[in-house]
Amino acid sequence: MTAKQIIFDEAARRKLQAGVDALANTVKVTLGPRGRNVVLDKKFGAPAVANDGVTIAREIELEDPFENMGAQLVKEVATKTNDVAGDGTTTSTVLAQAIVKEGLKNVTGGANPMILKRGIEKAVQVAVEELRKQAIPVETNKAIAEVAAISANNDREIGELVAKAMDTVGKDGVITVEESKTLHTELETVEGMQFDRGYVSAYMVTDTEKMEAVLNEPYILITDKKISAVQDLLPILEKVVQRGKPLLIIAEDVEGEALATLVVNKLRGTLQVAAVKAPGFGDRRKAMLEDIAILTGGEVVSEELGRKLENATIEMLGQARQVRIEKEKTTIIDGAGSSEAIKNRVAAIKRQIEETTSDFDREKLQERLAKLAGGVAVIKVGAATEVELKEKKLRIEDALNATRAAVEEGIVAGGGVALLQTQKAIDELIKTLEGDEKVGAQIVRRAVEEPLRCIVENGGLEGSVVVEKVRTLPVGHGFDAMKEEYVDMVAAGIIDPVKVTRSALQNAASIAALILTTEALVTEKPEKKENNPAPNMDMM
């Protein structure tokens, strides 16, 4: 076992803070309408240009192992906020930095970190409740377009596209982002279906960076059987290999020898194959497999229907233009099923919805209907260069996530204003607290003004002056950093989803409180490199 080095108390916390600052200072230059870009060096190909907090955070690895721990903890804040809300990663990083900075001052001054943590948690809870009170529901297309445009760094064109996509497939529809072969960014609606089952083995992925498997024009084998013996699969595998196309297997399960054979063939490049478990359970699983079969123009290979897997023919397999498989979901795009058969199936499901008395069944039937009839909207991103394309694609993904979050929990004034305006609620809480708990709440009160301060400073103005002025304005009014004037934020279209703002604050406080309560850091001791002395010339 390698030797470890340990540091304690103040020294440990200072190292963590240095790591937090290194990461946060890099990320926060991108915040706001006048935020700058960060260029990331790639080992292969051109450098990447990013304006997105989590993308930048993921690239940062510090040399000092203790400082690196601090940076990795804040990276966790950005990643967690991105996972939950899909946006707000820069805001959460800025908040975490502010809470750590203020908190460490107090811990150094003798405050008890555990009680500080309690105060921080209480203040965050009050702030989140206040954000929910300020929330305005998002219903119109105009509101959706504004949310999307802001998240895409004030790009109106992207805002319109996302709003149009949501309008086409509905708020629960599936929207994916692909790279276009042209210079233009456009919207395409594709008949498609998504279900919540991912690949059976991670060895099946085709894109290791995104951890997803993409099969173009695959055959699709649909069966309700558990496949473990490779003998059952061999006949159909041989037929597919002869055709030279990828294969997607949807089965109750694929395991043992059969799974090993598929993985080995995939890794050797003999056959591009992916397997997913069938969605749903019991009778609903049979119905969903039937839906997939109708959508792709295939048949369900089931012994109940007198079809054995070892006798399966190519004609029984479904087909689609593309299948995308992630860890927990699969999307079938442009199935080859006949539109007549799909129409009949949709009509049958609608009849079942009318006849059913159970709310649960109705909900599940409506889900199936949306999957069959709703389709998938594809935003095809076009740009002049590869670097611009990647940057634009990231912004569109951000905009999509922000918009979904806005539809879910509503919106509040953007530009860091809603957070600042939770201060009144926090002040009320502070009056009821005492000692270090009160100090903890005051730390959060100070931290919630940091995003606004940062946006203003990125615009080249004095943060403190603007923060003081916004404090005196009515709720929902704040500072437009683009035009440099005080406005009604919602009317001016400067808005943030509640879910994004709330997640940013909750995740930042959670990690920052961990850093404040840290008393020791343990890391591996770097091995000393031995210098081999050059041979003496006399020895030659």
Swiss-Prot record:
> Which key words are in the record?
ATP-binding, Chaperone, Cytoplasm, Isomerase, Nucleotide-binding
Query: Might you give the EC number(s) for this enzyme?
Result: 5.6.1.7
Q: Which CDD domains match?
A: GroEL
Q: Which GO terms describe its cellular component?
A: cytoplasm
Extract the InterPro entries matched here. Chaperonin_Cpn60_CS, Cpn60/GroEL, Cpn60/GroEL/TCP-1, GroEL-like_apical_dom_sf, GROEL-like_equatorial_sf, TCP-1-like_intermed_sf
Localization: Cytoplasm
Q: Which Gene Ontology terms describe the biological processes this protein takes part in?
A: protein refolding
Which Pfam families is this protein grouped with?
Cpn60_TCP1
Q: Which PROSITE patterns match?
A: CHAPERONINS_CPN60
Name the positions where ATP binds. T30, L31, G32, P33, D87, G88, T89, T90, T91, G415, D496
Reactions performed catalytically:
ATP + H2O + a folded polypeptide = ADP + phosphate + an unfolded polypeptide
Molecular-function GO terms, alphabetical: ATP binding; ATP-dependent protein folding chaperone; isomerase activity; unfolded protein binding
Q: What does this protein do?
A: Together with its co-chaperonin GroES, plays an essential role in assisting protein folding. The GroEL-GroES system forms a nano-cage that allows encapsulation of the non-native substrate proteins and provides a physical environment optimized to promote and accelerate protein folding.
> Quaternary structure?
Forms a cylinder of 14 subunits composed of two heptameric rings stacked back-to-back. Interacts with the co-chaperonin GroES.
What family is this? Belongs to the chaperonin (HSP60) family.
Under which name does UniProt file this protein? Chaperonin GroEL
Species the sequence originates in: Symbiobacterium thermophilum (strain DSM 24528 / JCM 14929 / IAM 14863 / T)
Q: Upper taxonomic classification of the species?
A: Bacteria, Bacillati, Bacillota, Clostridia, Eubacteriales
